[in-house]
Amino acid sequence: MQGKNSHLTGITGTTHFTIFGASPRSMSLVKNSQETPPFPGMNSTMRPVEFNSTKQPEAQTIDQEQDAPKSFDFKNQTLGVYSDTVLNPLKNDSFKDELVVDVQKNLPIESLTVSPKSSTDQNCRSTNEAIRIAGFDNFADQLQESNGVFEACPEAHSEQGNESEDFKDLINSETECNIEDVVLPTVHVSTDSEEIISGDVIMNDSNVVSKPKNLEKVETPDVLIGSGSNDKLSDMTEQIGNNQHLEKLISEKTEKSLSDNETTLKPVPVQHTNSVGSSIGTTSGDSEISDDDQKSWSPKNESLDYQPASTSSEFTETTSVANQTESNAGSVDDYCPRTSIDIGLDSSAPSCSSDATREPTPIKKRGRKKKEQSATEPPIPRTKRAYTKNPNTIRKRRMKKNQSDDEEDDGPPKRRTINYQIEFRDASGAWTMAQQLIFVRDFMSKKNDKIVKLSKSRQDRVDKFILQFQKTQDSHYMRAAIQLNTIFPDQGNYRHCQDYLKDLTIRVVVPPKRREGKRKSEVPANPPALLLTGPLYLNFYCTSQEVLEAAGQLLEFHVNAVYKDERLQPPVADKTLLDLERAMYHEQVKDLTDYHKYRIPCPTLTVTTKEEVFSSDFERILNSASITNISGIAKALNIKTELFSLPEIAKCHPELSIDILNQVPQSADGNCDSKGIRCWDVTSYSSKMKLQDFERYMQKEESEAMQAFETISNCTAKELESTCQKLKAERIAAQNAIEGCDETMPWIKFGTNIDLLSENFKKQMNEIEKLPTFLLPNREGNLLNYAGVDVLGINTVQMYAKPIGSRTPAHMENSLMASINWNRGPGTCVWFAVPYEYWGQLEFMIGEHGHKYQDQDYWPSEKELLELGVPVIKFEQKADEMVYVNTGCFHWVQSNSFCINVSWNVGQPNFTQLATSIVAHDHNMLIGNQAHVPLVNLVWNAARQRLFVDDPEMYKAMRGVMIRSLAHSKWYFDLIDHHDYIVGDASEWKLADRVQRCKYCTSEIFNIVRWYTTEDLSVDSYPFCSHCHVANEYKKDRFLKYTWFFSLETLVNIFDAYVPN
C-alpha cells in the first residue's frame, strides 16, 4: 500500500503506533498454497496478492497542497477506512485517507475506538464502511524487521496489559519504512447495510469465482495486500531496509501540509491488469469493464504486470474486491475462521469478539458504471436513483415483484419454471365452473323440474365440488339492516367533509393590497385557466359591475383580483367517523378482527310499501350513507321486472350495435392479468356485437352451465377431476377467436353501455318512471337536466348484460354524481366501495401501481387497502335489489353469475352534490382528465331558471361559479381586443355546438372558444381552451379566430337576475 501523507494507525498491547504512507490499494483472493512463507510473519497458507481484480477501481489522489496528518486520541470514537475507491469515502475531514489497523501480537483485541485530538474535529460522522484485518500473528515482528516508522500515543496507554518488549523498542524510534512495499494481513471489507465479504467468494480449480452452496464454514484463501506480484516480492523486502531511500520518499510526500478541515481527493488513472507470473488471473468474461476500457487504463498496453505507482507527489489510492456480486452474500466468520477485528464508525455498535458470527447480508446490485473523471474533478457522490413515475415502468416492476412473491418457498431455493398463465387458466376454469353450478342450483332449479328431482347423492356431489372452491374464498360480504328512522353518525355533515367542501367553494377572503402603478410585464396572449375552487375576493351578493371592474385589473395590472389561485388538496379522512360506524353496526357485525377492522358493512334498507319508498326519510337515508343497498323496491312499486330481461330488450332493438368487453373470468377476491401475473391491471379487449347476437351468446352460456351441472352430478368421485379438465378444455375449444386475445385462455363477453333511449325502449322507461322523483333520470331539479346536452350513461339510462365473471373496474362516477344500479338478476353481483374522503389515498396507491386515477383499467387489492387503513365496503347485491351510490363514492363491481343491470346517474340538488362536482372539475383539469358533465354551462342554465336561490349554501356555490366564469369571459374579451384577434358569434361562424371541449386537455370550454381554421373550412378545426399550448401542426396554413356563445351583456343580465327572493 502506498500514499501521500497517509498513515496507518493501530494498537498493539497498550502501545499505539502510526505508519506513514499507508493507504488501501487492491485486494484479491488467492488459492491456498503450502509453500514456505516468503515474508516474515506470514502463515504458510498466505501468499502475496496478485492485482487482478475483476472490476476496474476508480483511482483517487490527494492534492499536494495538504497539511500533515493529525495525531489522534484512542478514546471514544471509532475509526474506519477513508477511501474513495470501491469503498465509499467517509465524509469527515479529520480522517480522510487514514486506515486504522487493530493488531495485538498473538492475542485478539475485540474493539478499538479513537477520537481526534483537535476540538474542531469532534463531530466525527458515522459511516457504513469498515475494514477488518485478521490472521497476521507476527505483524509487529514484521514491522520491526522492516524498520517501520511509528508514532507513540502515550496518553491512550492505560489498560492493555503487558506489552511486547520488541514492540516497546520500536515505538521509541522513528525509523524510515517504505510502506508501499509492506505486505498486510488478510483484509475483509464490509458495510453496515450491505456487506462485501471476500470470504464467500471461492476460487475453484479452474480459477472461476463461485459461491458455496451453503453457509457452513469453508476454509478460504488469505488475502494479502502488497504492491506487486510474486516475482517482485524479493524486491519489496530489499526496499524495506533501504532507510535512506524511504526517508527521502517520506520527506517528499510531506512537504506540503494538509488543511485542518478539508482534504480533496482527485481521481487519476491507474493501470489495472493481470499478472503474467501468477496462476490466478481474470478472463474477459470475469471483468466488468470492456477491452476498450482496459486500454484506456493502460494506454501503451506494454505489459500485463502490475506497475507500482511512482514516488511522485501525486498519490494514488485504489481498492477492489474480486468479482463480488449479489449472489455472494455470506458470513465473515463462516468463511474466515481465524481471528478478525472490527473497526467501525458507530460508537454504539457492539464489540466483535474473535468467535462472533454474522448473519449473511445481501449485496446490493451494482448500478451503472461511473463515468471517467478527470484528475481535477471531485469524486461524484453516490446518490439514490430517482424513482420513476412512468406508469409502464411501475406496472412492470409491480408485476415482477408479484411474480417473485409467487416463487417464494420456505425451504432452500429451488430451480423451477412456473407457467403462471397455465395456472391462471386452470384456476379461472375451475372458478367459472363452480359459479355455473351455483347458478343452476340456486336460480335455475325453479324453472327445471329435472334439476329439482336430483338424487341426494348427485346433489351432494355437486355441493362438494362447490364447497372446495368456496373454502378458498375470503368473501366477507357484510350487510347491516337499517330502518327508515336510522340516524347516521355523519348526519348533516356528509363523511365529515362539509368544512372541506365549504372551504374550497364558498370561502371569501380579503384581497391583497394592490401595488401602485402599472406592471411592466407583457400582456398575456390568453387568460389563465378557469378554476372553480379557492377563496374568492368578492362576496356572493356583489353586482356584475363589481365583477367586471375586478376582472379588468388583469389587463391593466396583470393580477387576478377576483379569486385566489390555490392548488387543490384532497380531504383528510376523519378516523373518528369510522369508530362511530363500527359502534353503530357492532350488534350486527361482530367478527371484525384486527385485520378486518377497516371493513364497513353496507347499510341495507328493506322497503315493503309504496308509502315507505316515497317518504322523506327514504330520501334522507340514501343521501346520508356512502352507499346503500335497497331491497324490495321493485315489488313495492309493482315494477314489471320481466320487461328488463335480455330477450325482451333484444326484441325492442335487435340490430342495435353494442360494446363488448372480452375478459378472463376470475374470483373477485384477487386479480391477475391474462398472463397469470398478480397485479392491478384489468385485461379487457373491446369489440362490437349486435344485440340479438349477444342475446344468443348469453343463452349458449346458460346452456353450458346446465350441461356442466348434469355432467358433474353424474360422474363418480374418481372421475371428477378428469371430467372437470375435459369440460374446461371443451369450453376453450368451443369459443370463437377474438382479435388480440390469447385463444388458449377462457374468455367471456361482457355487454356494456347498452343505451335504453326512450324511442326504442318506451315500455322499460315507463316502468322506471314509477320510482320516486329524486331517483328519476329526468326529474325536475336534477342537476344533470341542465347540462345542455345528452351525455350517454349519465343523464340517460343504460343496461349491462353480464355473464359469469364480468368486471366493472374501479371508478368514481362522472363529476362525482350519484348513481343508481338495479340488478334485475337472476344472479348476484359483488360490490366493493370506499368512502369519498379517502380519494387522496386511493389516487396515490393507484399511481404507485402504474395507473392513472381516472382510467377505468385497474382492480384494487382489497388486502392492500385494508393494510393501509383504507375502509372497504364489500357486499353482495342480490336479484331485484337496487344500489344507490352517493356522491364521490369509489366503487368496483363483479358479477358472480348471469345478471342484467340497469343503471343511470342523478344529480341531487343539494350543496354536497354541487360542491363535490366543483372539486372534481378542478381535479380533472389538473390531471388532464375529461369531465363529461359540462358543469359551468350547467350552473348558468340553472341560474337562468333561478333555481336554488332560496337555499343559502346552494346559492353561494352557484354564485361562486358564476363570478369566476363571468370574470374569465371579461378577461378573454379584453385580451382579444388588445391583441386585435378575429372574433365572431358562434351562430354566425356555424362551427360547432355550444358545449365544446379542448382538443388537448378535454376540459369544458365555457363561452369563448379558440380555433385554428381556414376561411372556407376546408380543413378540420379543433377547439382549444385558454391555457393549453397549441402545437404547430394545428397552426400551419391556418389562422387564429375566436367564437363566443354568450356576449358579456347576456351574462351580466343572467348574473344580476340571479338573486334571492
Curated annotation (Swiss-Prot):
Protein family according to the UniProt entry: Belongs to the UTX family.
Keywords: Chromatin regulator, Dioxygenase, Iron, Metal-binding, Nucleus, Oxidoreductase, Zinc
GO molecular function, one term: histone H3K27me2/H3K27me3 demethylase activity
Low complexity: compositionally biased ranges: 310-320
Protein name, entry field: Lysine-specific demethylase jmjd-3.1
Matching Pfam families: JmjC, KDM6_C-hel
Domain of life: Eukaryota
Keyword Transcription regulation: no
Region Required for binding of unc-3 and for function in Y-to-PDA transdifferentiation, annotated ranges: 418-759
Subcellular location: Nucleus
Positions of region (Disordered): 30-49, 256-417
Tissues showing expression: Mainly expressed in head and tail.
GO BP term, example: regulation of gene expression
GO CC term, one of those recorded: nucleus
Gene3D superfamilies: 1.20.58.1370, 2.10.110.20, Cupin
Region (Required for nuclear localization) residue spans: 369-417
InterPro entries in UniProt: Corepressor-Demethylase (IPR051630), JmjC_dom (IPR003347), KDM6_GATAL_sf (IPR046941), KDM6A_B-like_C-hel (IPR048562)
Effect of C1028S: Disruption of Y-to-PDA transdifferentiation
Residues engaged in binding Fe cation: H811, E813, H891
Major location (coarse): nucleus
Broad enzyme group: oxidoreductase
Annotated EC: 1.14.11.-
Domain called JmjC: residue spans: 760-923
Assembly and interaction partners: Interacts with wdr-5.1 and unc-3.
